[in-house]
């Protein structure tokens, strides 16, 4: 299969991105893992531009057709691509709203035991006042342990279904929420945005039918950053944390910011999506706010740390594997698993390895 690589220092053209999308569709991997192949090929072939209007409207039209046919899963998948990677245009923002609505219709159709929970958040003047998450329980277990999981820049709580199911199959309840600065998160990503997790952890602890005194944490892609930070700043509340391809320090330095603007593993607008997550209004603000996330510079890496598993592909071009080596040189010992390939090290054993490790921390800790 032909591999598309963006030329150094520039984004892909429309034609190059169409090839990239077809490759992802054929492989059935993110962000096209749930799309109907025939219908998706037609949308890809008919794309006229990568700007927010052209992109959002093309995929939303496909979503509307799927909705009209009662095909909620494909409608959800099309609306997700319509806002991908971030809703930085009105057409993409409209797609993001429909993405959430159709996800709940999918849950209803498939008879998932899914509850959308909203809890208060004591936000600042420019922040939201509540945080929403999806709560699911494994059947037949009276008081299961629980893991909170979140995605990264473009994979939000609605894209965590496969990982949620893996935890449910392992007898673990799940709380799926949005990474700070994405989806329905009430905050932007900032050096103290871990505040958004506290009311969620409090909610889990207060449920009499959950073993929520010390929970598991699972951060996917950029979300692994928060799993790492929470393991260091709230170790008494966390039984174990998994950082699946998250950064720590090197990722936020100027040289990596420039080197990772146009990685071959990412479709488009990675810097724009990161900037929106940070609440940045321009590239200079993006660079400044990204640098402020360094856990090394924040001085927390020598703090006692909850059990922490660091996972990534060996040749990640979005998050430097040097951050894993850095974390091993500071503070408490950590567990590490590298997999072949690039960002996140996708493969048949990746998610099962992480789920088994986290289950051991939750169930075997006594």
Predicted features by range, described:
Residues 143-152:
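Short beta-strand element of the alpha/beta-hydrolase
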Residues 167-184:
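Conserved alpha/beta-hydrolase
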Residues 329-345:
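Catalytic histidine neighborhood in serine/cysteine hydrolases
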Residues 232-289, 306, 338:
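Hydrolase active-site cap/lid region
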Residues 52, 59, 94-140:
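N-terminal cap/lid segment of alpha/beta-hydrolase-fold proteins
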Residues 303-305, 310-312:
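Short beta-strand/loop motif that positions the catalytic acidic residue
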Residues 159, 166, 187-210:
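Alpha/beta-hydrolase active-site loop
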